[in-house]
Amino acid sequence: MIKMAESTLPLSQNPMRKVKLSKVTVNIGLGESGDRLQKAYQLLQELTGAKPVYTISKKTIREFGIRKGQEIGVKVTLRGAQAEEFLRKVLEAIGYRLKKSSFDDYGNVSFGIAEHVILPGARYDPEIGIFGMDIAITLERAGYRISRRRRKKAKIPKRHRVTKEEAMEFLRNNFNVQLVEG
């Protein structure tokens, strides 16, 4: 039986423990289909430079006039340099301030923007109108692929998951984000 050597690197220097930006998801939920949905699609494509997908309702809600399977919103997922670039734009628009309550226990951050016109480079177009959007930031470490792969899928151990505090530290160090109570 071969005994493995203990790691001599502290946790902060271990490359597998380094937190990284996995993806940024931008969602515009309208709750209706039609012309306004097409305008939201066009706007999201202009702002992100990526092709959005339509979100579909899961159930019928008569009071809102929504049927199951109806397209009711648009979203786009950004990864890599594109995600980082868009995230910097969004953080600049909100003044690099995030509420501590925006973070969940698994290192994800979600917040909203009331009007898209506050984003740098975005202009108001009376034909399109003004849309609000939700932004979700997903952080992960190297090795998270084991939870998504097809064969030999496994859970991420608790000690390897990104915590709320690590997510806050990552955004503070890499994006100069100030955390406010709330």
From Swiss-Prot:
Domain of life, source organism: Archaea
Membrane-spanning segments: none
Entry-linked SUPFAM superfamilies: RL5-like
UniProt entry keywords in alphabetical sequence: Ribonucleoprotein, Ribosomal protein, RNA-binding, rRNA-binding, tRNA-binding
GO cellular component: cytosolic large ribosomal subunit
One GO term (biological process): translation
An example molecular function term from Gene Ontology annotations: tRNA binding
Family: Belongs to the universal ribosomal protein uL5 family.
Function statement: This is one of the proteins that bind and probably mediate the attachment of the 5S RNA into the large ribosomal subunit, where it forms part of the central protuberance. In the 70S ribosome it contacts protein S13 of the 30S subunit (bridge B1b), connecting the 2 subunits; this bridge is implicated in subunit movement. May contact the P site tRNA; the 5S rRNA and some of its associated proteins might help stabilize positioning of ribosome-bound tRNAs.
Subunit text: Part of the 50S ribosomal subunit; contacts the 5S rRNA and probably tRNA. Forms a bridge to the 30S subunit in the 70S ribosome.
Alphabetized PANTHER family for the sequence: 60S RIBOSOMAL PROTEIN L11-RELATED
Protein name, as recorded: Large ribosomal subunit protein uL5
Biological source species: Saccharolobus solfataricus (strain ATCC 35092 / DSM 1617 / JCM 11322 / P2) (Sulfolobus solfataricus)
Record lineage: Archaea, Thermoproteota, Thermoprotei, Sulfolobales, Sulfolobaceae
